[in-house]
Amino acid sequence: NYQVAEVNILGEVVRKWDLKALGYNFHHEAVIGENGKLLVAVTKMDATLNTGQSRIYDHVIEISPNEGTITQAWDLAQILDSARYAATDPSLPGASFGQTQGNWAHHNAVQYWGDDIFASARFQGVFKYHRNGELAWIISPHKNWRPEYNKYLLKPLDKNGNEITDPQVISGEKSSPDFDWPWGQHTPVIMPNGHILVFDNGYARNYISKVFTEPGQYSRIVEYEVDETNKTVRQVWSYGSEREDCYAAAMSSVQYLPETKHVLFCPGMGNKLSNGTYGGHIIEIDPQTNEIVFEMEICTNFHRGTRLSLYPEGM
């Protein structure tokens, strides 16, 4: 967990970076941007709460690959509302996947968006921030954010582009036929048209915690359109609410396939399979028609699913 490595098609390690020597521990994601820098989701090994308790999954570092040095670092506790925490009763269903004081954010995805940083925190939302650490916007239920964050919280729109005014939909206490927030989400993707594709795990949707086998739960692949000027978010398309067999409380991923404009929906754990056991799915969908082009059951849990070309670009 302390190293990030670059590996070639033959499985040979081309180069690696020792994060422990820099004071960090790797988790979830590392990407190389067009600027040639390495952006890594990390835990800072000496980061603590005011109580002295360790905190995890709430830092990002940028590394110069050739020098192996940190060019910039961000502490998400200085960007997001680290006080937005609700203690989870350990006796509640699904509590093992829930928020803890030390794991208040559970940052699980990071990538460049131009010169900005685009990220996901499982318990806080999908968000974009600038290099100076200033927030641009947040896609998240509005409940429990401190007032100083209100200007960053995107306002939901219905399918016709009208602002949703129902306070319970805005807070996340109920869903609308036209809109729902992402819950416990993973792997947000920037689409070529500037929209965002997200795996909405549906964990504790509307703040209701359940055992993962309990009926009525679902995960979705969802496409959002963000208007940065007017600070709004519109749900363009989604799939999964009709597939309770694809509910995944954690892990999982989505992918946009530019060659066909199809998408991959990859719920990675706890799915009820046709043989009565549990595992995951890989499903390719045409969003224009909602046609399932390909579907496969995986008889074990998995972190993410990604379609790769047979050979790297340029070969």
Language-model regions, residue ranges each:
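Histidine-/acidic-rich catalytic cores in large beta-rich domains
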Residues: 1-315
